[in-house]
């Protein structure tokens, strides 16, 4: 990108490999792809059609005597094999199989994977191979009913993720990616938007295994410059994104743009339409999508559209989110619509009793406003079943050198987890209560506000395990039941002077903290 509200780091920060090949090999240099492409079609519980395409490379030799074989494995069991006739001079091999009764890749519930192996032989001797995992699935979005995976409703509840963290910037170790994914799955995500640029292939591989749906995208961010070199760069990045990641079952969408704005430089509509056509040509099996914050014609160019909206943070009122969604849906009922970004800043070291809308560009971002923001926004989003997705902005705090806000300069603090991944903010547990129904828990919000300035308080708790009882210094304050978004509240509780041990319990667990009241 030529601009963006995030840091763009340079340098080599992924693995480096030395490729040593025979004179004939499976093509390693076709847009840095694997040279092997698996295309699924007509997938159902009854059968799945798979087209296999392999590209070969030959240096100063012919491909005479070369043969390509495809093998499909279920775990370690060989299910089928198919061999090509001798490879032609176009150095391209096409094969087809039909798999009866495939075990489907079914998201986080059952991310079942097969293994596809492509073997190149010359004069009967194996000289190259590729092994890639295959997950058979079918999916679609409906403008009125939302998203479906394998024929069943599957609302995509997810987060945005920048590949950026304390001490590493973008230079992640594999365990850093794993930690991010562990935190997302603890919260209950079933999808991740890998914003706003191609991220590590290791991330895609792990999302295949974990069943997390991936939205991947090119860095066409904010502005467009009507320039042949700019256009060609966009085309090249889209080709690389699609061809390098073509076989990953977790990737269901190709993202073409984020917050492109006709009012800043040149109009981006022509380029958005061209990128859509290119993506459909390269991969007709996946829809295109864009993330927009504009009311413009390009919102209708992609197969799916989602919007970045921050009602209740950058001005406006919290309730405007639902009203705006309904107006947009009524104006364009044919569009398959989702929410790609919504969020509010929070610093875990800034706490207050009062609930006041902070200045987003100011230095005071109390945690309780972020919590309130997400509770109120999720109430509105969950009610609108026609939305095919909702992605929180964002999972982790990240670096943005141009920002002068919150407690740390150069930091976007809208994450649900801190930049170093050490502290989960209250809003993290709110979403865990709504999205994760397996890991039963109760959690007291506001526990970091230890020194209280009010004697009378409301106690707020998040629970995915039903009702809970409140105790303060051992005294019972009754039972509260969760509301429609799994929030429990005890209103008007009078604290004791001095130390107050707050404890919440139910049959699945407990949580406690200490609040100090000087009055």
Annotate each predicted stretch with a short phrase.
Residues 169, 178-184, 191-434, 438-458, ...:
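Substrate-binding/catalytic cleft of secreted carbohydrate-active enzymes
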Residues 1-196, 200, 204-214, 237, ...:
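Secreted/periplasmic carbohydrate-active enzymes, especially glycoside hydrolases
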